[in-house]
């Protein structure tokens, strides 16, 4: 049976602040092959929903570097899933910047019309919006300090879940963080002269109907999860179709 539950906005903010300047070792870090911002945003949304969508190609899930959906790490794919999802998992809509609240998600657009960065709102105070992000790392950074041409805001309304597969994800999500090297840049805005890197390519979808995978410990998906995706043995270079910062 498919039911709906509340999207836990407080958990999103807590997770965002905890891992803005560190990394959760349960998830691959994409800095070296494009950028980690949408991967980080997906983790934050997972903290507020504890529900993935394992639909092949069009779902929203992460099992490993080569077993993930395009929507987990790609700016535009993330937007498309969150604003059009009719199945299990979080779902939402586009709102105006004047409506923004903590746990909303902001995506920045450059002067060429490309959305390149995903931010997690953690505070709205005295007319200023504060965000957390990865690559470049930011902890409660003012949105006004970013240089961008335009933006769009995603509001997650609720979460659909299958009552057969109710999983408590918090023990896994709140693993000890991995500290970053001290010389890792933090809270630096991408500039137009140095275009933001794009998101690494998503794995190729399975050629036939998926079967149950063997997921990481403590993050067991339902039997509908995809089996093995055709993907390179090591992370590949970013493509023009998946943008991130």
Where are these regions (language model features)?
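N-terminal capping segments
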Residues: 1-73
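A broad, low-specificity signal marking well-ordered, structured residues that form hydrophobic/aromatic
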Residues: 12-14, 129, 151
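Short loop/turn segments at secondary-structure transitions that flank enzyme active sites
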Residues: 47, 51, 125-127, 137
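Short, solvent-exposed loop/turn and secondary-structure capping segments
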Residues: 54-57, 118, 143
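...with weaker cross-activation on analogous glycine-rich loops/strands in unrelated enzymes
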Residues: 61-134
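Terminal transmembrane helix and immediately flanking juxtamembrane interfaces
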Residues: 94-96, 137, 145, 169
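Catalytic alpha/beta core of large soluble enzyme barrels
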Residues: 132-133, 137-148
């Amino acid at each position: 049976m498919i039911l709906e539950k509340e999207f836990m906005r407080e958990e999103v903010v807590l997770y965002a602040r905890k891992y803005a300047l560190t990394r959760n070792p349960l998830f691959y870090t994409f800095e070296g092959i494009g950028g980690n911002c949408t991967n980080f945003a997906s983790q934050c949304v997972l903290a507020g929903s504890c529900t993935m969508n394992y639909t092949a190609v069009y779902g929203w899930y992460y099992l490993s570097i080569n077993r993930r959906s395009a929507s987990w790490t790609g700016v535009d794919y993330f937007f498309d899933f969150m604003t059009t999802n009719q199945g299990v998992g979080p779902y939402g809509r586009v709102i105006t910047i004047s409506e923004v609240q903590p746990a909303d998600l902001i995506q920045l657009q450059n002067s060429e019309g490309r959305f390149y960065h995903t931010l997690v709102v953690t505070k709205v105070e005295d007319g200023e919006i504060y965000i957390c992000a990865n690559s470049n790392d930011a902890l409660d950074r003012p949105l006004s300090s970013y240089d961008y041409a335009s933006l769009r805001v995603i509001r997650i309304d609720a979460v659909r879940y299958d009552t057969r597969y109710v999983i408590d994800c918090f023990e896994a999500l709140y693993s000890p963080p991995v500290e970053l090297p001290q010389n890792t840049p933090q809270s630096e805005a991408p500039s137009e002269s140095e275009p933001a890197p794009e998101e690494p390519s998503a794995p190729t979808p399975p050629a036939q109907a998926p079967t149950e995978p063997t997921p990481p410990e403590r993050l067991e998906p339902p039997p509908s999860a995809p089996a093995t995706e055709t993907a390179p043995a090591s992370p590949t270079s970013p493509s023009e179709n998946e943008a991130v910062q």
